């Protein structure tokens, strides 16, 4: 009988068993998603506790009981007011999660999601030009839906798109931080954030906004692991974990110091001295460079300093090279004293040169006097000829020509006189005027 009943109504028994199971789990007139946490099984309660501990932080908004249906809200951080950012702080250290970043907040808790998904963080595809983060961060935030559509669409041909901003490489060691921060600052400047980055003098053109602060904060922690940061950077972040601007300011200052060290080494290696400037000025210049290097924990020995100075000596100071060539114990003070001695000797010689030249010029203007006459005639030689004066050769030529001409005239006169006398004596002829013929 029982087997026949089971064979006749197999669905009824299976349906009653299914109904009994479902009646234990969820009431028939209740939404399955509306079950409270108290009615869930134990493994669901444990998962709920774990999720609540990981997702809920101090100062966050209340999460509804139906956590399967509603996603948790990010931490609400009030925007900073007037004043320095290190005084306000974007987040308190209590909000930092216990992870490798002891003093950094997770990027997912920042309220600027569209900056975290910047295309600059992705590897550039040569077949698809990614749009660049060009507009300033201080502008109004775009709609997430529009931004997703904008990233998904291929840019038009007529749209001018600059080259993609390459992100900085990840920091690999504490010693490379000074080099890494240069690439990071260049990355921020290429991202149109140059106005809030300190310049070489440590000055900032404009105060950064909350969104710009969040963007710098997220990019810094993304590419600089905390355990690889230098000690002085960790000390700043322990006071205020979001004070990246102070880190950048001190980094720029240290870069200027490093550049000054390089300039000092170049100046010390290219020293030149020929006596055109005073020896005291040269000594002060060299001593200042050496003292500045010493303040930066770079000691320059006297032997090295003397060798660099001797290499640049020229003129009357050049012979000091041979004098110091065989010396093993070189003293910088002794070298400066010898340079000063040579400079003083040359200075004295230069002062005596004008007086000697004056005596020589007076010797040229010689005064001639005749001892037999009472009236003294002073004749001054004039070495400058006027335009009207003629050279001696021309004068001699004129004199010779005039004397020759006078000699010819005298001979002609004498010949005429002799001939006339000869006629009158021999022939006794007298010259008479011609008579007219009739």
UniProtKB/Swiss-Prot annotation:
One example of the protein's molecular function in GO is:
RNA binding
Superkingdom of origin organism: Eukaryota
Residue span of region Disordered? 1-86, 366-397, 419-438
Q: Which UniProt keywords apply?
A: Cytoplasm, RNA-binding, Transposable element
Keyword Ribosomal protein recorded: no
Q: Does the keyword Cytoplasm apply?
A: yes
Q: Which regions are flagged for Low complexity bias?
A: 369-381
Q: Where is this region: RNA-binding?
A: 295-397
Q: What does this protein do?
A: Capsid protein (CA) is the structural component of the virus-like particle (VLP), forming the shell that encapsulates the retrotransposons dimeric RNA genome. The particles are assembled from trimer-clustered units and there are holes in the capsid shells that allow for the diffusion of macromolecules. CA also has nucleocapsid-like chaperone activity, promoting primer tRNA(i)-Met annealing to the multipartite primer-binding site (PBS), dimerization of Ty2 RNA and initiation of reverse transcription.
Other comments on record: Retrotransposons are mobile genetic entities that are able to replicate via an RNA intermediate and a reverse transcription step. In contrast to retroviruses, retrotransposons are non-infectious, lack an envelope and remain intracellular. Ty2 retrotransposons belong to the copia elements (pseudoviridae).
Describe the subunit structure.
Answer: Homotrimer.
What does the entry's domain section say?
The C-terminal RNA-binding region of CA is sufficient for all its nucleocapsid-like chaperone activities.
Q: Under which name does UniProt file this protein?
A: Transposon Ty2-GR2 Gag polyprotein
- Protein source organism: Saccharomyces cerevisiae (strain ATCC 204508 / S288c)
């Amino acid at each position: 009988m029982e087997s026949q009943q089971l064979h006749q109504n197999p669905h009824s028994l299976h349906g009653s068993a299914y109904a009994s199971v479902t009646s234990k789990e969820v009431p028939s007139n209740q939404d399955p998603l509306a079950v409270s946490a108290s009615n869930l099984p134990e493994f669901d309660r444990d998962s709920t506790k774990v999720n609540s501990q990981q997702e809920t932080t101090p100062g966050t908004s209340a999460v509804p009981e139906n956590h399967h249906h509603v996603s948790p809200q990010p931490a609400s951080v009030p925007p900073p007011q007037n004043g320095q950012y290190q005084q306000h702080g974007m987040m308190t250290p209590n909000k930092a999660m216990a992870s490798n970043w002891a003093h950094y907040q997770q990027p997912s808790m920042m309220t600027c999601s569209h900056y975290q998904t910047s295309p600059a963080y992705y590897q550039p595809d040569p077949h698809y030009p990614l749009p660049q983060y060009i507009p300033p961060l201080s502008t109004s935030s775009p709609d997430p839906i529009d931004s997703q559509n904008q990233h998904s669409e291929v840019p038009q041909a007529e749209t001018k798109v600059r080259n993609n901003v390459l992100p900085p490489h990840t920091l690999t060691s504490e010693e490379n931080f000074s080099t890494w921060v240069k690439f990071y600052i260049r990355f921020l400047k290429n991202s149109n954030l140059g106005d809030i980055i300190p310049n070489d003098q440590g000055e900032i053109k404009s105060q950064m906004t909350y969104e710009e602060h969040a963007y710098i904060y997220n990019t810094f922690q993304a590419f600089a692991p905390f355990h690889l940061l230098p000690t002085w950077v960790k000390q700043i972040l322990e006071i205020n974990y979001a004070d990246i601007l102070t880190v950048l300011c001190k980094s720029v200052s240290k870069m200027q110091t490093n550049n000054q060290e390089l300039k000092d080494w170049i100046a010390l290696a290219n020293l030149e001295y020929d006596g055109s400037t005073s020896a005291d000025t040269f000594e002060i210049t060299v001593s200042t460079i050496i003292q500045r290097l010493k303040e930066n924990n770079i000691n320059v020995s006297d032997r090295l300093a003397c060798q660099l100075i001797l290499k640049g000596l020229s003129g009357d100071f050049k012979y000091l090279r041979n004098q110091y060539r065989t010396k093993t114990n070189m003293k910088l003070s002794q070298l400066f004293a010898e340079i000063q001695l040579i400079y003083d000797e040359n200075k004295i010689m230069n002062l005596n040169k004008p007086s000697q030249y004056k005596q020589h010029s007076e010797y040229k203007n010689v005064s001639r006097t005749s001892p037999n006459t009472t009236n003294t005639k002073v004749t001054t030689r004039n070495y400058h000829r006027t335009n009207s004066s003629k050279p001696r050769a021309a004068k001699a030529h004129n004199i010779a020509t005039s004397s020759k001409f006078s000699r010819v005239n005298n001979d002609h006169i004498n010949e005429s006189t002799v001939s006339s006398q000869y006629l009158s004596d021999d022939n006794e002829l007298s010259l008479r005027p011609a008579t007219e013929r009739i």
